[in-house]
Amino acid sequence: MACSRFEYVKSFEQDDSILPNVWIVIRIDGKKFHKFSKTHDFEKPNDENALNVMNAAATAVMQEFRDIVLAYGQSDEYSFVFRKETAAFKRRSAKLLTYVTSLFSSSYVMQWSKWMNLPLAYAPCFDGRVVLYPSEQNLKDYLSWRQADVHVNNLYNTAFWKLVLEKGLTNQQAEAKLRGTFSADKNELLFQEFGINYNNLPAMYRKGTILLRKRVILGEKSRQAVVPLHEDLISSQFWKEHTEILGKYVPGTYDAPQTFPRLVEMQINGKDDNEAEEPQNLAGTS
């Protein structure tokens, strides 16, 4: 940039560099998503395709930022965990936050037609925040908090919408029936009145979606992809099985189901090997 007498205005900019050696988490949340989901007729209590739009948008963010070691999503929110040593955008908070939020929002729009049958009536909006965690335990507790939130909300919403859609209760009547109940009460209600064992519902609804970068075996070859998991990250077993998250970041091998999830298939079929393996470097970006 050429020097001029107006350059002094740069002195008003704030230094928002993030402290070194801390875990950086960026969480994005949908803005007025109740209205958005109603306008686009999302299935209640969970719309699998709508959740997969979120997962696909988050995958696009992880493909852009190689320093994101884990992403976790539920409902209309997603959390992105950057490794402690990241130098992306010189660790400038505003740059990281705005890039992730805008990239997620635009990717959501681009992914919409690949998953949803209805046309997009208007663009969604997401806000975001940056939170720093100094220790591994702090980070684990944060992610455990978000997954516990999934369980509480999904159990309530499943019971609520069963009462409304199948029993014909009004929203107010369903709220009154569930008021003051505990998890055991809601589980009992679902089983006794609807024949539903809550633990048999799809894991994505009960546990949210964890995105990790893994090496996918394809015959005699392999390639990296962002894969969706629906596991219990509150347990210590999760961290033992995915040691690359907190350790030296070398993606482990994907323990693939019999059929690849569509999200993985889209990555495998949509890019050539060179593009998939190309590292990303935002360290020097201002």
Swiss-Prot record:
| A GO molecular-function descriptor | tRNA guanylyltransferase activity
Q: Which cofactor does it need?
A: Mg(2+)
The record's cofactor note says: Binds 2 magnesium ions per subunit.
Q: Which cysteines are joined by disulfide bonds?
A: none
Query: In the Enzyme Commission scheme, what number(s) does this protein have?
Result: 2.7.7.79
Q: Where does Mg(2+) 2 bind?
A: D29, D76
Q: Which UniProt keywords apply?
A: GTP-binding, Magnesium, Metal-binding, Nucleotide-binding, Nucleotidyltransferase, Transferase, tRNA processing
Cellular component aspect of the GO annotation: mitochondrion
Q: InterPro entries in the record, alphabetically?
A: Thg1_C_dom, tRNAHis_GuaTrfase_cat, tRNAHis_GuaTrfase_Thg1, tRNAHis_GuaTrfase_Thg1_sf
Return the broad EC class. transferase
Keyword Cell membrane tagged: no
Catalysed reactions, semicolon-separated: a 5'-end ribonucleotide-tRNA(His) + GTP + ATP + H2O = a 5'-end phospho-guanosine-ribonucleotide-tRNA(His) + AMP + 2 diphosphate + H(+)
Q: Which GO terms describe its biological process?
A: tRNA modification; tRNA processing
Which residues participate in GTP binding? D29, G30, K31, K32, F33, H34, S75, D76
Q: Name one Pfam family in it.
A: Thg1
Question: Where on this chain does Mg(2+) 1 bind?
Answer: D29, G30, D76
Q: Which PANTHER family match?
A: TRNA(HIS) GUANYLYLTRANSFERASE-RELATED
Q: Please give the function described in this protein's UniProt entry.
A: Adds a GMP to the 5'-end of tRNA(His) after transcription and RNase P cleavage.
* Protein family membership: Belongs to the tRNA(His) guanylyltransferase family.
The protein depicted here goes by the name Probable tRNA(His) guanylyltransferase
Origin species, per record, is: Drosophila melanogaster (Fruit fly)
